[in-house]
Amino acid sequence: MIQKISSILLLLLLLLVSNNGFAQINQSILMLGGQEIIGVPLDQSPEEIVLKTTKKNGKVKILLIDISRVFSVTQNGQEEVWYNPDSSETGYSIKEMRYYIKGQQDGRNEHKTTLPVITSFLVSGALAALTGSQELAVVVLSPIPGTLIGSLTKGNMPSNEKANGGEPMSQAAYIAGYKQSARMKKIFHSILGSVAGTVAGGIIGLSIASSNS
């Protein structure tokens, strides 16, 4: 009887160890947008992957990843490309899509948004100060013009060194990816600049209105 119980306990222990070992195998998922997501796969269907990720603070988060947005999955140093050129709207080959993804990553990491932020801050700040000084309710709409003008500032292209290297089609894919990412970054930072400008300008405008009353 004791021997039988010991065998069962040993079997359960082996199952537990093997399950834990499997669960700790991380996958690195490269998205078509250039994001890299690292986590433990929990489940997978034809449409999505259920991934468990752990943040730097130790907090665990469960993500549902759309498989159609995945370029490749790397596990144990081996990359498996999931991207299918035939089902892609871009028409990029696997090699060209790599350049497109690299462009998105560089645009997100390297593109400077100083001018859009300053422009959106000044435009929204000036409008907020003006409308706030007159105690007009439209002061809350001040971020909109600043965001629009900041987003329209020029400069979504990569550096000449990166834009002019490589084969023509790969070069075009890289530039397209960079411009897409740079545009989104510029819009987001313009929104932040406009909101900050509205707050600063609104405080100044309301202070002026208060001193005049």
For each predicted feature, which ranges?
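Surface-exposed short loop/turn segments
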Residues: 58, 211-212
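Short, solvent-exposed mixed-charge patches
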Residues: 24, 212-213
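Final/C-terminal transmembrane alpha-helix of multipass membrane proteins
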Residues: 188-208
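Compositionally biased alpha-helical segments
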Residues: 22-188
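N- or domain-start disorder-to-order transition segments that initiate the globular core
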Residues: 13-14
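N-terminal signal peptide c-region/cleavage motif recognized by signal peptidases
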Residues: 18-20
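Bacterial N-terminal signal peptides that target proteins for export
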Residues: 1-9
